[in-house]
Amino acid sequence: MKLTDLSNPAFLENPYPLYETLRAQAPFVSIGPNALMTGRYSLVDSLLHNRNMGKKYMESMRVRYGDSAADMPLFQAFSRMFITINPPAHTHLRGLVMQAFTGRESESMRPLAIDTAHQLIDNFEQKPSVDLVAEFAFPFPMQIICKMMDVDIGDAVTLGIAVSKIAKVFDPSPMSADELVHASTAYEELAQYFTKLIELRRTHPGTDLISMFLRAEEDGEKLTHDEIVSNVIMLLIAGYETTSNMIGNALIALHRHPEQLALLKSDLSLMPQAVSECLRYDGSVQFTMRAAMDDIEVEGELVPRGTVVFLMLGAANRDPAQFTHPDQLDITRKQGRLQSFGAGIHHCLGYRLALIELECALTTLFERLPHLRLAHLDALNWNQRSNLRGVNTLIVDLHAKN
């Protein structure tokens, strides 16, 4: 198996057959110099919790882009984000924003998520059909993030376009030269935008997420300007396509299992379980990476220090050793902990908010549009990404009678 297999058109349409092959070749598959991959649930979970497995962001970029990666401003910016670094710097940076994503703070966002969903549906409810990605799934999380940051909602579309250009950074297969230029330009545009906003919040602080970040920074260790900008942008990136793509993936999974869709519509109190099961079945985040900080032994195989390990979360979530009938969607499933948000010290900080957003988005759609039906279920336009998996468009009939 090669890293380029993850950019194969057949894989991008349906990655799960390759994941089955990957799980059968345990413990690891070599995908290049100093690079391994695994999709077994037990191994993925164990390595996510292993303190000898950490982040070596530039090493993982060198695997994909060669030694010149360390000199690229885009990757230098990402290397300052707390999701790409190790303790103690990781602990400090994560702590600065953790207070905004506690259970209580996340739950307090539920009314905002519900209101945002209703407002978006108001714009297209009377139409016979609509592209739900463009009209709902993409603007929904971006508008929530903008409100959390007290950013002008009128800028949401521009910010979303810039973030989407950067999103391919998270793919295991390398971007083309043109894609890299577009991503770098988009990041610079975001950096300029948030530099102005951060300076404004320093002189006129509020109760928003950026002001909270700056207040926490003032009370603790000082950060460089570039560190602050990178981590504010990281919050924007982390909360956007992870959620927007998952709204589409969940609707697709449910419509491909009509009995499960009918069950959910008959009892919307099942929504939290349904969201978790859809995340397991076809999550937007398909993989994460760790690097061996020291030589470690895994199931009798040596993983040398510096080795980058691709942990395929999507494969782990379909592992029959962990989940009975893993290729079936079952919204009443109670077994197993899904890997969609990772685990260990880098477990997704915003997972509670993501779950609330997904619950509110889908519940409001089904309440307001009970006859919503996907129009082209067998001809979906997947976004050609092996990570942040989703569709570019999702045409739905809003008032179908059967």
Curated annotation (Swiss-Prot):
Q: Any coiled-coil ranges, and where?
A: none
Is Oxidoreductase one of the keywords UniProt gives this record? yes
Question: Which residues are listed for heme binding in this entry?
Answer: C348
Record keywords, A-Z? Heme, Iron, Metal-binding, Monooxygenase, Oxidoreductase
Keyword check for Metal-binding, yes or no.
Answer: yes
Cited CDD domains = CYP164-like
InterPro entries named among the record's database cross-references: Cyt_P450 (IPR001128), Cyt_P450_B (IPR002397), Cyt_P450_CS (IPR017972), Cyt_P450_sf (IPR036396)
One Pfam family cited in the UniProt record for this chain: p450
EC number in record:
1.14.-.-
> TM spans, by residue?
none
Q: What class of enzyme is it?
A: oxidoreductase
Q: Which family does it belong to?
A: Belongs to the cytochrome P450 family.
What's this protein's name? Answer: Putative cytochrome P450 133B1
Q: Which organism is it from?
A: Xylella fastidiosa (strain 9a5c)
